[in-house]
Amino acid sequence: MSLAENLTAVQQAITAACRRAGRDPKSVTLLAVSKGMPPELVREAAALGQTLFGENKVQEAKAKIPLCPGRLRWQMIGHLQSNKCRDAVHLFEMIQSVDTPGLAEEINRWAEKQAKTMPVLLEVNLAGESTKFGFSPDRLLAELGALNALPKIEVHGLMTIAPWAPEPEKVRPLFRKLRELKLQCEDKLGASLPHLSMGMSGDFTVAIEEGATIVRIGTALFGPRPKAARPPASEGGG
């Protein structure tokens, strides 16, 4: 199918999942995962009305973003190294993959230098997979107050990467667990966290049924990435 057909199919699946869950389809944002994809495809998606894109690597984003329409919005969804924080804070409207207190502090430092406040999501490793990054639920709750106190960071919610499963229903308990963890975080902070970023091409409808507000879709939109561009399982969208 063409990109236009794929985009329509994904949007229809989002709407159907929202209806099953009794949710407004406008409460779910489609983030198009453009990692490994050329600027031409991003421009084609933009011409079809897609405006939010996600990248996994700062260097790739740094080269790609200037070649794309300026009205597009970009978020960082892959593992971020501390030495890339300066560029990440400059390039992205949100960093979804904050996985350690040290990284949060470095983002805060560069946001202060660049005179901006950086929205972030805290990445949670719910399945305890050694191949993936993220806070354990217990550590997240223990560190949450200190993370939220950083003056140039705004914690907007949580993100997770579910293990691959042939049947999406198998990861439903993890998505439900992230939603419940967000409620615990809100109780601890005494404030609402607007976002749950969870669900990729193979399981996003289940994620929506469990409360996702952002779904990260790559393959279902753009087709399989070239082999050289395929990221490891620890990366944040597909």
What name fits each language-model region?
Residues 212-230, 235:
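Gly/Pro- and small hydrophobic-enriched strand-loop and loop-to-helix capping segments
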Residues 1, 235-238:
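Eukaryotic N-terminal low-complexity, Ser/Thr- and Lys/Arg-rich leader segments
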Residues 1-202, 208-210, 222-224:
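Conserved alpha/beta-domain cores
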